Amino acid sequence: PEGAGIWLRLHPEDVIASPYTSWTFDENTERMPEFSAPGIGKRSTKVVIDMEVKDNTSGVLFAMGGDGGGVTCFMENGKLFFEYNMLIIERYFSTEGQKIPAGKHTVELLTAIPKPGGPGTVTITLDGKPYSVCEIKRAVPAAFTASETFDVGKDLGGSVSMRYHEKAPYKFDGKINSVKVDLIKNK
């Protein structure tokens, strides 16, 4: 029926979602459909990345979605960044943190999105210490896209971020040991 395409925007509770609440990925994860992947960028989540970097490491740690909307966590010249592409309408960026020294590190991204389509905050820590923050004015209520995917260690398809669009798929040149994602139940 006419207008049926806006149903999920008005009723995000009807979105098809994975039954899982916890995932563990490695750098071989690619092209996982959004509706099967964790709800990163749409729900409250905790993402823990176990990685090894060299001086000036660059590349995508993970990306969900594409140029039409999505989220990405990436490194550029040794610094860590997070970007939230709200369907091209708005883009939200993390504050810039310090250069990360060579070695093994743990990055945690704690995303608080209390309700679909509402505002949110992504708090990023490095080895247990505050690193940067991304304030989201409006989160995507249902889905970023029906055709893009979740990737670890690269951003296949359309690039979530214009910062690395010309370098796509912007393969991570460090080592990703694991990316653990847990959904957080909102109160």
Task: List each language-model region with its residue ranges.
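Extracellular glycan-associated modules
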Residues: 1-187
